[in-house]
């Protein structure tokens, strides 16, 4: 992931808000560490950033897997986080999956110095990233921006050998956590935005609302995983209505 995904909306948001675009450890422009990344590591980073940098109660917009970090952070530190907007969050069923022996073996092989690095470079090659964006992330393939692809390619390779540690940790489910209780217990205002063509998007939103009926939602037309990139105007309209 990369903070670059917010480049099309951050200037507009900054007109009425103080905006911080945070690349978490191992992501985007941030340092790549040779560690096993976990959900709670990112929870600590988010809470520490709010406490030490922002220094006031904070509204958060998060997308994809990062939504689980924010959910846990809101349950862990109720005084730091105010309103929350999620963009296409990962399903709670998927997040509840735990690491298996097969997952641990995969992580071991990916983190091998030569063989693992070779496999990782195939997985994050320009061609693979391009195909993934076209097939999985964009509603309209003609919307794919070369600068976005370049940012994600750079993020996947920045940091040399340790660049692969985030991927190996996520693939082996070390970053997973069952957030059902957190979703149920937090009393923050939560608004889920889903792309019209996001696979299982409607079912995922329904599952969150079943656990916490106070959650509101909206669907952004002509978009998939990145409504804040593909349909900026409609996305900003939802942000303006919520915050």
Model-predicted segments: where are they?
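Conserved hydrolase catalytic core segment
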Residues: 55-101
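Conserved loop-alpha-helix segment in the C-terminal half of the alpha/beta-hydrolase fold
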Residues: 185-223, 229
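Conserved acidic catalytic loop of the alpha/beta-hydrolase fold
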Residues: 40-58
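Conserved catalytic-core motifs of eukaryotic protein kinase domains, centered on the activation segment
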Residues: 5-6, 30-36, 96-98, 203-204
């Amino acid at each position: 992931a990369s903070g670059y995904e917010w480049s099309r909306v951050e200037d507009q948001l900054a007109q009425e808000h103080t905006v911080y675009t945070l690349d978490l450890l191992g992501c985007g422009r941030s340092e790549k560490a040779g560690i096993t990344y976990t959900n709670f590591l990112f929870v600590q980073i988010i809470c520490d950033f709010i406490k030490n940098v922002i220094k006031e109660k904070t509204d958060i917009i998060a997308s994809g897997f990062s939504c689980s970090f924010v959910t846990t952070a809101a349950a862990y530190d109720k005084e730091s986080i105010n309103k929350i907007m999620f963009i296409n969050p990962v399903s709670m069923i998927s997040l509840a999956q735990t690491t298996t022996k097969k997952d641990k073996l995969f992580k071991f092989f990916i983190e091998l110095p030569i063989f693992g690095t070779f496999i990782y470079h195939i997985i994050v090659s320009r061609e693979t990233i391009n195909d993934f964006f076209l097939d999985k992330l964009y509603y309209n393939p003609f919307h794919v921006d070369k600068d976005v692809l370049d940012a994600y390619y750079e993020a996947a390779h920045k940091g040399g050998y340790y660049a692969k540690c985030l991927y190996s940790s996520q693939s082996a489910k070390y970053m997973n956590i069952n957030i059902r209780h957190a979703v149920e217990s937090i009393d923050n205002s939560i608004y889920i935005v889903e792309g019209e063509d996001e696979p299982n998007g409607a079912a995922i939103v329904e599952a969150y609302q079943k656990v916490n009926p106070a959650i509101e939602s909206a669907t952004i037309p002509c978009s998939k995983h990145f409504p804040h990139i593909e349909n900026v105007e409609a996305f900003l309209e939802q942000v303006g209505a919520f915050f």
